[in-house]
Amino acid sequence: MDNFINGYIPRNSFVHKLHPTTKLVIFLLLVILVFVPIGFVFQSVIFLFVTFVFFIAKLPGRFYSSAIKSITLLFLLLLFVNWFTFRDPGFYLTSDQLNSLPAIDNSKFSFWNISLFNYQDNVFSQVFAFNRGNLTNLNQLDFFYKANNADSYTKVKGIDSLASMLANNGNGLSKDKILSAFLDHNLNLYLARSWGANFAGFVVDFNPTTQLFKLTPFLANASYVLTLRAVILAFYVTQKILIMILFATVLTSTSSSVELAYGIERLLWPLKLIKIPVNVFAMTIAIAIRFVPSLLLESQRILNAQASRGLDFRNGGFLVKMRSLSSLVVPMVSIAFRNASELASAMEARGYHPAKKRSSYRQYKITWIDILALFLVFAWFVVIIFLTIRGAVFLDLGTPEWLLTGKINEQVIRDLKVSG
């Protein structure tokens, strides 16, 4: 990638002026957030933040486009995998509707009156159930959530059979009124967007011991079904990698190898108390980062030189390409060892000794800008982690309302003849 080949890019920007240790701490906090399951919405906020930092650092836009191009193939590969592994779009039940069901614990679905959505990952999971013993009139329908005891249910043939059973319970309600009330309450379901998947109906289960009816929605899927969930999952994972690439680009493009070595050494300073050679470790990392651009540039030169001699790296079978690759690997290894030897000789000539204490020519001071940046990022980090632990973020991928299609219409449910 171009940013690695060019390495450090001097600019007069806010990001360049930050203390090296400050940039490393912010980088580590963002990496932690990327690997924490914070949900698609919060991760998108982090992505926008990293993009904002990238451009206020005054880095060339081609670096940004290069990073996106480099993960396009990964996105397509993940989309292909998710196409066949996540063919189930699932159903949604909104928190507003959950709040109308008195027996549900709404604490995990709402936080500070934020409207959230509960994603039913498996369409063969129960959405809600109701007790027929409380069905004395249309105003006393007692709906509530029932968790993981579907094995005890006995199949009922369909919605009409369910309405007939309730009407024969001696409650004085006709089948049509019960069916009408049932349909009204079951318009709480949303079907996630998909191509080739259609709502097919409910399997209605009855437990004679507890007098509970469980409603399980199911779908009719075409062979080519592609769900929006599969697309989001592919983008979700790709976005994680893109965030790390972009911020690594910002870190290496706004900090020289000397600054990175200084920042790493200061960040790992407590390890000196247990006799770990932090300065050697920091110097090793700084040298490795410094030589990545050089080696990539050398590899490009070798590829061009070999191509000018008629060597084809793109065409041919697998074995042919592997033999051609040796023409790149062997010179690269030779160049790497040669550079390492020259660097070691140069450092010895300048009197470098890893066991000796070294002074620093450049003095980096913590300013109020560093303190403010650390405070804001750390506060943001704590809030996101807190909301994640509380379960107050959008569940699973954090699917917002615009990903939902309309309610399953009444006529579709009314016309169903579902067999158990």
UniProtKB/Swiss-Prot annotation:
**Which Pfam families does the record associate with it?**
CbiQ (PF02361)
Organism in which the protein naturally occurs: Mycoplasma genitalium (strain ATCC 33530 / DSM 19775 / NCTC 10195 / G37) (Mycoplasmoides genitalium)
Instruction: Decide whether keyword Cell membrane is in the record.
Output: yes
GO cellular component entries = plasma membrane
**Cellular location(s):** Cell membrane
Q: Does the keyword Membrane apply?
A: yes
Quote the protein name from its UniProt record.
Answer: Uncharacterized protein MG181
Keyword line:
Cell membrane, Membrane, Transmembrane, Transmembrane helix
The record, for InterPro entries, names: ABC/ECF_trnsptr_transmembrane
Which family, according to the similarity comment? Belongs to the CbiQ family.
Looking at the UniProt entry, the stretches that span the membrane are 26-46, 66-86, 231-251, 276-296, 317-337, 369-389
Coiled-coil boundaries? none
Annotated membrane topology: Multi-pass membrane protein
UniProt xrefs under CDD domains: EcfT (cd16914)
User: Would you say which domain of life the source belongs to?
Assistant: Bacteria
